[in-house]
Amino acid sequence: MWEIVHSLALSRRSVLGGLAATLLPSGLSLAGPSSETLLHRDDFTGGLGQWVIEAERGGRFRAEGGVLDIDSPAGVTLWFRHALASPVAIDYEVMAVSEGGPNDAVSDINCFWMATDTRASGGDVLAIRRSGAFAGYDELRTYYAGIGGNRNTTSRFRRYVGRRDDRPLLPQHDLSAPEHMIAPNRWYRIRLVADGNRIELLRDGTPMFRLNDPAPYTCGHFGLRTTKSHLRVRNFRVYRLPG
């Protein structure tokens, strides 16, 4: 079993902000940095309604006070319900918690983006329920990044090709230097980019992984991912990039 805690204490400001984001007439939008267009947001004050959870062995998942808390004893993926299309950027802040809890391992700040499933009609990742075990995602076509994996000893980027037991890894996307790992209890700014052939992950404004993809994945879902770890996430935003 997993426990989901929904925050019911919505402030007047967060309610009005949410209505502004969801009730804009067609053709109107909110602008982000550099004339980027805000498509989606989650300030984690109104529960987990925008997320689908696949948890291997339960856990505690709650959204309250502006923070999504992911406390999991095993593998878990939280899929953002809205499908995304390139050119797009996904922004959020994330922390690996070290406060003495049973899952406070400081490990595995991971994610999927532009994910589709080769087994599903139309490729919809939400059409198939998975156990949360990592091997269950092999048949996705997606970009995947794992920061501080293997108990905070590796950081890797992969382009999944939709085949079981086939997760290609290029040498330049297999990092092991200390500066590419995770510091405990520190907020990191993550930006994921899918803009035509340009695929990127930036951490605190600095490119960490880059791929010039000649056959880019141009639509799909975003998923937060970790395993036996305790993460906190805040300020989740999705922008359409100019182009």
Predicted regions, residues:
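C-terminal alpha-helix/helix-terminus motif
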Residues: L19, L23, G27, N235-R240
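Extracellular glycan-recognition regions
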Residues: G32-G243
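C-terminal segment of N-terminal export signals and the immediately downstream linker at the start
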Residues: A9-L10, S26-E36
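N-terminal secretory signal peptides
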Residues: M1-L10, L19-P25
